Amino acid sequence: MKAFVSGVALCGAAYLAVIATPKADQLHYAATLTGAAETPPTDSKGSGSVIASYDTDTKKLQWTIYYSDLTGPAIAAHFHGPAPVGKPAPIEVPLEPPLDSPLFGSATLTDAQAKDLADGMMYFNIHTAEHKQGEIRGQMQGAM
């Protein structure tokens, strides 16, 4: 009987340890890409969207980016920060070619980059030959 009680106690302790272990959060973000949001604004008819998730345990940001109607092929695409809407900022996460839509990728963020993302201080933009400073841009915002 003593062994049975010890076994039950051990199983109970193991169960509590498992349910008490903190789980990573999956945080979701999105951005709408337009020429009007670029800095300085462009008259581009291009548009796009960014859908991203951030794993707080692995610190990995994963994204899917769609865009269309740019003035030419994308020559560069990046996440920038820290910057509020309408302000420029350095590149934080560059995307590697090919840059054809849709773009799928991931990167491990530093703690500072994760804070920029969480605080709405990160944006994504796409550059073309006609708009070397950026053709379309969107500020990353928390999403459900």
Where are these regions (language model features)?
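Bacterial N-terminal signal peptides that target proteins for export
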Residues: 1-9
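Metal-centered catalytic cores of metalloenzymes
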Residues: 15-77, 81-144
